[in-house]
């Protein structure tokens, strides 16, 4: 069955590269949907969702965004619109995967478009700034693939063709095998940070009682933040939050903070949560 793969990018600067990805996807028998987050300039490539529609999703006109006179604010507004559009495509079953390419501004656009998508939905970002301080951990979706381009995405050449072909092949492969996550058993999350003894006891005990257990490595944005995200996606029946050292990290400016809203999601959603002060005696800076 053909899949619908969304391509998010700025056609005013990356039309050639986006067209290359679209052609690859279509050669593999799938449908490509281009979402244009560009702001100025013309493009030879017609999008499926125009920049005007993206701006409208953010309750602005393109003229409003141009009038901001600030590239950062402009792309942030377009990112808001792109995120709403991509999420709507997912929610209506009109998208099976999303890929984006970009430099600094295009990366902001793509990451925002992927951020609200659920765990398990295929998402891949090709970026020239993937592994730099410009991309913070909290900007990235929990299970998103980040691909660093070794050269700038400024037209097609022997290197960019290979990078984009690999990225397109990856997202096609993920779309072909991806299915919506079905929680067949009650799912319980347990947090840990290199503390194994209680997990070795709790996990089999819960499994014997018909539960499935997911262990969260509580190491900040890819730990406790992941837990809060999974809870908000309503995938869990309860939480054993026995390793809460990320709170100390947050209070003391530690490197492994999970943000100021740690411990809040379970109560907001309304599922049982047991909390213990595990790993509170140290933090990282």
Task: For each feature predicted by the language model, list its residue ranges.
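N-terminal phosphate-binding or glycine-rich loops at protein starts, especially the Walker A/P-loop
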Residues: 2-43, 97, 103, 107-116, ...
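Gly/Ser/Thr-rich loops at beta-strand to alpha-helix junctions
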Residues: 10-16, 96-109, 130, 188-199, ...
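Generic secondary-structure signature for well-ordered alpha-helical cores
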Residues: 13-16, 23-31, 83-91, 115, ...
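Glycine-rich phosphate/diphosphate-binding loop of Rossmann-like nucleotide-binding domains
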Residues: 14-26, 33-34, 39-52, 183-220, ...
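Phosphate/nucleotide-donor binding subsite
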Residues: 46-92
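Cap/lid and interdomain-hinge subdomains that line or gate substrate/regulatory clefts
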Residues: 66-67, 134-192
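Short, acidic/small-residue loops that bind anionic groups at enzyme active sites
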Residues: 97, 109-138, 148-149, 214-218, ...
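A glycine- and small/hydrophobic-rich beta-loop-beta segment
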Residues: 242-285
């Amino acid at each position: 069955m053909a899949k619908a793969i969304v391509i998010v990018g700025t056609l005013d600067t990356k039309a050639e590269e986006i067209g290359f990805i679209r052609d690859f996807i279509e050669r593999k028998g799938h449908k490509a949907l281009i979402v244009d987050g560009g702001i100025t300039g013309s493009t030879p490539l017609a999008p499926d969702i125009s920049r005007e529609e993206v701006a409208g999703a953010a309750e602005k006109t393109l003229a409003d965004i141009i009038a901001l006179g600030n590239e950062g604010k402009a792309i942030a507004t377009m990112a808001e619109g792109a995120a709403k559009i991509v999420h709507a495509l997912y929610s209506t079953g009109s998208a099976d995967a999303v890929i984006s390419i970009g430099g600094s501004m295009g990366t902001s656009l793509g990451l925002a478009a992927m951020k609200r998508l659920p765990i398990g939905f295929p998402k891949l970002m090709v970026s020239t700034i993937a592994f730099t301080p410009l991309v913070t951990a909290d900007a990235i979706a929990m299970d998103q693939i980040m691909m660093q381009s070794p050269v700038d995405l400024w037209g097609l050449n022997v290197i960019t063709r290979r990078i984009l072909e690999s990225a397109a092949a990856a997202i096609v492969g993920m779309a072909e095998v991806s299915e919506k996550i079905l929680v067949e058993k009650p799912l319980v999350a347990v947090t840990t940070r290199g503390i194994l003894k209680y997990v070795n006891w709790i996990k089999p005990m819960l499994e014997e009682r018909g539960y499935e257990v997911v262990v969260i490595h509580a190491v900040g944005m890819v730990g406790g933040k992941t837990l809060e995200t999974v809870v908000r996606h309503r995938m869990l029946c309860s939480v054993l939050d026995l390793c809460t050292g990320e709170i100390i990290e947050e209070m003391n400016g530690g490197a492994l903070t999970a943000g100021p809203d740690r411990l809040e999601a379970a109560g907001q959603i309304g599922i049982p949560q047991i909390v213990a002060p595990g790993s509170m005696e140290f933090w990282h800076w």
